[in-house]
C-alpha cells in the first residue's frame, strides 16, 4: 500500500508555513521542508525559515542540512526526503511536505529523480525547451527514440525525454506515494503587497547582515544565487544604492511567485485554495480528513 502524504505548495509569502503547523497539529504530522534554500545553515531571514519557537514542537526535516559552500540538487532532496518520509511513517505519524521548490517536490512525487550530477539550471533549461514543443513534436520524439510509455500523455512524454536527454534513470514508473496536493493562492495585488511587506520586515530583522555574511563567505556558491541574497551583492560591491537593491529584491520575489504558480498549475495536479476565502482552512482540513479516511 502506498504511503499517504500531504503536500502544501504555493508562491512565496502566501502562508504555507503557518498552515503546515496547523495541519501537523490536527493530524499528528511531521514536516519536511520542500525549499531549496532552507537547507542551508545560516540562511534564516532571507529564506523565511521557520524559527524554532514557531515550530510549536513539531519535528521538521531538511532544514539546515548543508553549509553554504555546498551544493544541493533535486537528487539530494529526493534521497533525503524519502528517508524522512520513512522515518515519519515508522513513528506512526503523517508526512507533510511544505515548500515552494516545484522541481524538487515534483521529482519526489513522480517516482524518479535525475542523476545527482545534473545541475538544477540545466534541468530547468531543458524543461523550458520542451514546454515550447507541440504534442505532435513531443510524441514524435518519443517514437523516434523508441521510448515506451504506458498511458502516454504530455506530462509523461516530457519526463521521459528529460531522462533520456539528461542521462538520469527512471527509478520507478509509478510513484511510491499517494499525495494530496494543496496549493495556496491569493489575488495578485494582495500577494504582491505581502511580498513587499515581507521584504521590508526582512531588512528590519537583519537581512543585510545575513547577506553580507554570505557575500564574504561564499559569494559564488549555489546558496548565493537565491533570491534575497544575490540582489544585495551589487550594493555590497558599491554598484547600486540600498534602495535600488531592495526594489530589485521585491521585483524578483514577485516574479518568482508568478513562476511558482505557473509551475504548480501546469506541472502538478494540485487543488487550489484561495487564502482570501475566510473558510479556506476549514475546507483544507475537511479535504485532508476525507483523503486520509479513504
Curated annotation (Swiss-Prot):
For this protein, the record's Gene3D superfamilies field holds: P-loop containing nucleotide triphosphate hydrolases (3.40.50.300)
Identify the residues that bind substrate: 12-17
User: Hey, what's the signal peptide range on this chain?
Assistant: none
Q: What are the binding positions for ATP in this chain?
A: 10-17
Query: Which keywords does this Swiss-Prot/TrEMBL entry list?
Result: ATP-binding, Magnesium, Nucleotide-binding, Transferase, tRNA processing
Q: Which cofactor does it need?
A: Mg(2+)
Residues annotated as region Interaction with substrate tRNA?
Answer: 35-38
BP GO annotations: tRNA modification
Assembly, per entry: Monomer.
Q: Briefly state the protein's biological role.
A: Catalyzes the transfer of a dimethylallyl group onto the adenine at position 37 in tRNAs that read codons beginning with uridine, leading to the formation of N6-(dimethylallyl)adenosine (i(6)A).
What is this protein's name? tRNA dimethylallyltransferase
Amino acid at each position: 500500500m502506498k504511503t499517504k502524504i500531504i503536500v502544501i505548495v504555493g508562491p512565496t509569502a502566501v502562508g504555507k508555513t503557518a498552515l503546515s503547523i496547523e495541519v501537523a497539529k490536527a493530524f499528528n504530522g511531521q514536516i519536511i521542508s520542500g525549499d531549496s534554500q532552507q537547507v542551508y545553515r545560516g540562511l534564516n531571514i532571507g529564506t523565511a525559515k521557520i524559527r524554532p519557537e514557531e515550530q510549536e514542537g513539531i519535528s521538521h526535516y531538511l532544514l539546515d542540512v548543508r553549509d553554504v559552500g555546498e551544493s544541493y540538487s533535486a537528487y539530494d532532496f529526493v534521497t533525503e526526503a524519502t528517508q524522512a518520509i520513512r522515518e515519519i511513517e515508522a513513528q506512526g505519524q503523517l508526512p507533510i511536505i511544505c515548500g515552494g521548490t516545484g522541481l524538487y517536490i515534483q521529482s519526489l512525487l513522480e517516482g524518479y529523480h535525475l542523476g545527482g550530477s545534473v545541475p538544477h539550471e540545466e534541468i530547468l533549461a531543458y524543461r523550458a525547451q520542451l514546454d515550447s514543443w507541440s504534442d505532435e513534436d513531443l510524441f514524435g520524439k518519443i517514437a523516434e527514440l523508441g521510448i515506451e510509455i504506458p498511458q502516454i500523455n504530455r506530462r509523461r512524454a516530457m519526463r521521459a525525454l528529460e531522462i533520456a536527454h539528461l542521462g538520469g534513470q527512471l527509478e520507478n514508473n509509478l510513484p511510491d506515494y499517494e499525495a494530496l496536493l494543496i496549493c495556496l493562492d491569493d489575488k495578485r495585488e494582495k500577494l504582491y503587497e505581502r511580498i513587499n511587506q515581507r521584504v521590508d520586515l526582512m531588512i528590519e530583522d537583519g537581512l543585510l547582515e545575513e547577506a553580507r555574511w554570505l557575500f564574504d563567505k561564499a559569494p559564488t556558491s549555489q546558496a548565493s544565487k537565491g533570491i534575497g541574497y544575490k540582489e544585495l551583492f551589487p550594493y555590497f560591491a558599491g554598484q547600486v544604492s540600498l534602495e535600488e537593491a531592495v526594489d530589485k529584491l521585491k521585483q524578483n520575489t514577485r516574479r518568482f511567485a508568478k513562476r511558482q504558480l505557473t509551475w504548480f498549475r501546469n506541472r502538478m495536479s494540485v487543488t487550489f485554495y484561495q487564502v482570501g476565502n475566510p473558510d479556506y482552512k476549514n475546507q483544507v482540513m475537511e479535504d485532508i480528513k476525507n483523503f486520509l479516511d479513504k
